[in-house]
């Protein structure tokens, strides 16, 4: 009973985090994100695109911002990322369906999109398997900072290299 209760709380936390993470974070940091080709995860609805891309990982290539209020919502051009390989064909996905894939390996390049260091880029220098706070070397300042894991998304450049 206690385990089920804990899992329910953890599930609610994750869902709350994703529901509070608007697609605008991609728009705000699109220049830094596009340049580093971050890996994102599609978290949409089965109603959208018949659910074919749900939970797929992809690389952000470009972002299209609506010109006026009558245009469709902001969308991202992405290439699927499977088994460490970028697909050659692309898909257009509304930014609201894209969420970060959090870093988990030393040396991974990250973009921080929330918190006091938002907009900065860094490299993971220390991480524990259960850590919620990760030590990141901020590239701009070359200083080590503690950053909450859910505040950053990984970038392809160093992830599998």
Specify the residue positions occupied by each region the protein language model found.
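Basic, amphipathic alpha-helix used for nucleic-acid engagement in HTH/winged-helix/SANT-Myb modules
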Residues: 13-21
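Basic/aromatic-rich interaction segments and small domains that mediate binding to polyanionic partners
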Residues: 3, 20-27, 35-90, 106-154
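Short, conserved secondary-structure segments in the cores of folded domains
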Residues: 28-30, 100
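Eukaryotic Ser/Thr/Pro-rich intrinsically disordered, low-complexity regulatory regions
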Residues: 1-12, 70
């Amino acid at each position: 009973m206690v385990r089920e209760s804990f899992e329910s709380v953890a599930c609610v936390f994750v869902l709350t985090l994703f529901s509070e993470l608007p697609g605008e974070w991609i728009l705000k940091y699109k220049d830094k994100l596009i340049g580093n080709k971050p890996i994102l995860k599609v978290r949409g609805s089965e109603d959208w695109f018949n659910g074919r891309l749900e939970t797929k990982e992809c690389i952000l290539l470009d972002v299209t911002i609506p010109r006026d209020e009558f245009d469709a919502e902001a969308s991202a051009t992405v290439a699927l990322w499977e088994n460490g390989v970028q697909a050659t064909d692309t898909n257009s996905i509304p930014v609201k369906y894209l969420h970060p894939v959090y870093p988990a390996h030393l040396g991974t390049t990250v973009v921080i999109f929330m918190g006091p260091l938002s907009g900065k880029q860094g490299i993971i220098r220390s991480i524990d398997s259960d850590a919620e706070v990760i030590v990141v070397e901020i590239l701009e300042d070359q200083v080590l900072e503690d950053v909450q894991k859910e505040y950053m998304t990984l970038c392809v450049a160093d992830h599998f290299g």
